[in-house]
Amino acid sequence: MNDFIAQLPKAELHVHLEGTLEPELSFELARKNGVELEYATVEELLKAYDFHDLPSFLRIYYKAMEVLREEDDFFQLTWQYLTKAAQQRVLYAEMFFDPQAHTSRGVAFGTVIRGIRRAQERAASQLGVDTQLILCFLRDMSAESAMLTLEESLPFKHWIVGVGLDSDEKGNPPVKFAEVFRKARQHGYRLTMHCDVNQENTLVHIDQCLHTIGVDRIDHGVNSLEDPALCATIAERGLGLTVCPVSNRFVVQSLTAAEIRRMLALGMRATVNSDDPAYFRAYMNENLQALQEEGGLTRDEIVQLVSNAFAVAWLDESRRASYLEKVKRYVESH
């Protein structure tokens, strides 16, 4: 089954580019940019990856990205992820980036996105991996900061497919950013928001995503299973849920395999993703393999999860059909 998963054509819809910063690249960029790291070796840095909840992860996550300074740093970061994705048979990815985490350090929005874009173009031509970008607002910053970031994005609108909301959820509900997301919709962006697992007021947040914001997708969203009405709405609207099993194991000490199976049984379009693979030490294949080996998911369930990702991706219908046909042909021949 591992071999079957390894070569299965995949889409990834929930991966934070800053979360793909491998320790080796972190040290390389720190040397280049004269940034002093808290850790002397890669091994020491890996030992520090001792996350037990969302805030403990975010503390290390934001500190680590201080090594990203120049356009070429963002190119290298993105290229390294896309090279790995190609090796794991990811044909298509929608990637988050956190511009406020960089502009707040004095790195220009254009510096960030131009570096990422160069890697996207190279990956399309050299690796056969197609990608789109999702701009994520940091929910623990102000709505005013998010609105300014939205305005900064407009000259690069043709490079961005949608907007999302991530970072520390406590005290930062979706409605805090209702006006920002309304404006983003007017500019033609697709909408998604993180509703992380087991967060305070999570059911209220999911409800706000559905009924106040009107999202096209929900990132994580596992706790929706606690409310049959939310489940029914998500299923009826055909909304994607971008679940991240190995990430969940770090943050809530569970792969949430049983929950993923239940979503599938309820007709909810759950997908599997890596989230921050450099930190959780698991890319797409490792996430799917963990679900199969430890969670007991069947071959049919794995195929359904992978198909769901293409089905809810922000693609035109002809490209979607082409990707789904590749999955179908692979499954039939294996």
State each model region's role.
Residues 1-191, 197-204, 208-217, 223-334:
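Metal-cofactor-binding active-site regions of metalloenzymes
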